[in-house]
């Protein structure tokens, strides 16, 4: 089989970003070369596609307008051999695509009808520069638009939507997606694609649970996870993109926020302050566990009365402040919060039942666990003080 090539949508359109993330997750048999998508090995691509489809949320839907459902999805379904009497779920389209490619793997791989350009799904028309938004400037010569894309590319875009969705705020009609920062570079050095996928998976794992949490909690939890995966420096690891897809006035999908997600110096502070890698990983693991318990507390605290989440919010705020300002007061405050937590647990354990129960399930005494966390955190203070002499 000769390689199959498709011209990608221009940078600045969400369609490009969703296709890129689909290619990143698929990994084998398909790649991006500059502004082209290339299927290099149909057999490997077919196996990768089947594997990814088997692991996505089967019940997830995507934003569709009435025209999308009636004309575009219906057209895709007919070409893929699906029953068009009912509405096809995204997963049904992708499963059908996988079967078509399996049958054509030794021949053309992507059949001619899948290469046909048809009107674009509304969600794939979204761009990052409309209305003068700051994150990408509007083209000076003319307003760039795309109206059509090949069916195959649109199906890859749908796959990208499914694998990058991290959450929905229903009362605002906003869906959040995690995407690699700035997309996939036109010239990616060898070996970096694997690292990009590793970081994307980490960002997805954390943002899936924390996308709606205060920034200090999200950033600290992400930094701890990255430390435990071996990351040695701070970086912008992903973009959290919010798209308005619902609400009373929403007639089409529109980008409403693009937030770079970075570790803001936390990794560097911990790694330069603590020499022993074992202590580094232990601190990251303990803070990660505490934040996970805090997440449960914040989500259910009003009902349960648990206050672990309040402690975690204050602690992570102090840590992030220290990372940004190097103010020792913030670090002292963070450790003081942990010291007082030991007293709070003794005085009223019911208010910290989530933390107590989690630790006891692991065979750990809460006060001893907190004392060890305080010891590890104190290493940051000692390192700071040593740097002054």
Region locations from a protein language model:
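Long, mid-chain structured domain cores
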Residues: 66-143
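Long, contiguous all-alpha helical interaction modules
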Residues: 1-99, 236-389
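N-terminal functional modules and adjacent low-complexity/disordered segments of proteins
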Residues: 123-126, 139, 174, 347-350, ...
